[in-house]
Amino acid sequence: MKSFIVLAVTLCLAAFFMGQSVASPAAAAEESKFVDGLHALKTIEPELHGRYKRATCDLLSGTGINHSACAAHCLLRGNRGGYCNGKAVCVCRN
């Protein structure tokens, strides 16, 4: 009885792993679209990242530190400071 259970488990595992080794047609189609190396860098479109100029003044306006955060942002960029204008946009001084 013990050897029968071991044989049954072994056959089940073998069947499971045999089924996993067969590649599906969808995976083969995805691999055909794969581009490798330098050619990939030339063909891949760059990701678009939005620039949110109002993040410093808008997000921190409720805490009361919006002008300080804008000034710190401008100092990190190498300017003499900055302020938040009426449209909640950080304006850096030269």
Swiss-Prot record:
What tissues is it present in? Answer: Hemocytes and fat body.
Q: Which CDD domains match?
A: DEFL_defensin-like
Pro-peptide region(s): 24-54
Q: Which residues form the signal peptide?
A: 1-23
Could you state one GO cellular component term attached to this entry? extracellular space
Q: Which residues cross the membrane?
A: none
User: Which SUPFAM superfamilies is this protein grouped with?
Assistant: Scorpion toxin-like
Induction conditions: By injury to the larval cell wall.
Recite the UniProt keywords alphabetically: Antibiotic, Antimicrobial, Cleavage on pair of basic residues, Defensin, Disulfide bond, Immunity, Innate immunity, Secreted, Signal
Keyword Signal attached: yes
Note whether Secreted occurs among the keywords.
Answer: yes
Places the protein is found: Secreted
Chief subcellular location: secreted
Tell me where on the tree of life, at the top rank, the source sits. Eukaryota
GO biological process terms held by the UniProt record:
defense response to Gram-positive bacterium; humoral immune response; innate immune response
According to the UniProt record, which cysteines are disulfide-bonded? C57-C84, C70-C90, C74-C92
Q: Which InterPro entries does the UniProt record give?
A: Defensin_insect, Defensin_invertebrate/fungal, Scorpion_toxin-like_sf
One protein family per Pfam: Defensin_2
Q: Which PANTHER family match?
A: DEFENSIN
Q: What does this protein do?
A: Sapecins, which are potent bactericidal proteins, are produced in response to injury. Sapecin is cytotoxic to Gram-positive bacteria, and to a lesser extent against Gram-negative bacteria.
**Family listed:** Belongs to the invertebrate defensin family. Type 1 subfamily.
Its recorded name reads Sapecin
